[in-house]
């Protein structure tokens, strides 16, 4: 199915209040002014992602939300762990992995192409494809920026390329990091 339209602010408020209660229950000290500002921004922005998804992808169905990846890695005894914010499937049979990011104004070209930022999606794609036995050519990755302080265009979705070479580089970097931790 599709994401519901019209009740996003209510859903956000309920979820936000539950998270705040959990933090308070855990003994976290919160600054009320920041909590209030954050809630106001969230209510304001809550209804914007669904229309942005429809505009960007046209017809789509939600394949999964907050999908847990806990997948074996090749050549090491570790598991890859991650949570994919949203996966939609479009009429052409492609899967689109979407990672939501909040920001004040957006990202510049350097940030959009920074391997340390984009490798997250590359690794999600690799492990999602293996988990579901899907050809990686049928999976695309995207960042969706929710811009809190923008005057217009509060949601920006853009594709991040992640072919075989980039996947190889991301896996190599991850394995090197794991080796250095041992």
Which stretches of residues belong to each language-model region?
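Generic recognition of stable, solvent-exposed alpha-helical segments in well-folded globular domains
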Residues: 37, 116-119, 123, 169-176
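A non-catalytic, helix-rich entry segment at domain boundaries
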Residues: 1-68, 72
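Residue-level signal for beta-strand positions within conserved beta-sheet cores that form or flank
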Residues: 61, 93, 137-139
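Short amphipathic alpha-helical segments and their helix-coil junctions
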Residues: 17-20, 25, 97, 103-106, ...
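Metal-dependent nuclease catalytic regions and adjoining charged, substrate-binding loops involved
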Residues: 126-182
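Residue-level signal for well-ordered alpha-helical scaffold segments within enzymatic catalytic domains
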Residues: 1, 48-51, 96, 123-130, ...
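Non-catalytic protein-protein interaction segments used by genome-maintenance enzymes to assemble
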Residues: 64-122, 128-129
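Short helix-to-loop capping/linker segments positioned immediately adjacent to catalytic or ligand/cofactor-binding
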Residues: 33, 52-55, 74-75, 108-112, ...
């Amino acid at each position: 199915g599709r994401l519901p339209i019209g009740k996003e602010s209510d859903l956000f408020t309920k979820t936000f209040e539950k998270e705040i209660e959990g933090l308070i229950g855990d003994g976290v000290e919160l600054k009320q002014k920041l909590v209030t500002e954050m809630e106001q921004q969230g209510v304001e922005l809550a209804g914007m992602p669904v229309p942005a998804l429809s505009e960007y992808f046209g017809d789509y169905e939600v394949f999964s939300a907050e999908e847990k990846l806990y997948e074996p890695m090749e050549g090491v005894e570790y598991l890859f762990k991650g949570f994919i914010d949203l996966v939609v499937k479009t009429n052409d049979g492609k899967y689109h992995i979407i990672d939501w990011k909040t920001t004040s104004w957006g990202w510049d070209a350097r940030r959009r192409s920074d391997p340390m930022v984009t490798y997250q999606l590359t690794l999600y794609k690799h492990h999602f494809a293996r988990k579901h036995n899907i050809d990686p050519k049928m999976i695309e990755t995207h960042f969706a920026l929710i811009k809190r302080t923008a005057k217009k265009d509060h949601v920006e979705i853009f594709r991040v390329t992640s072919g075989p070479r980039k996947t190889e580089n991301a896996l190599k970097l991850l394995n090197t990091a794991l080796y250095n931790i041992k």
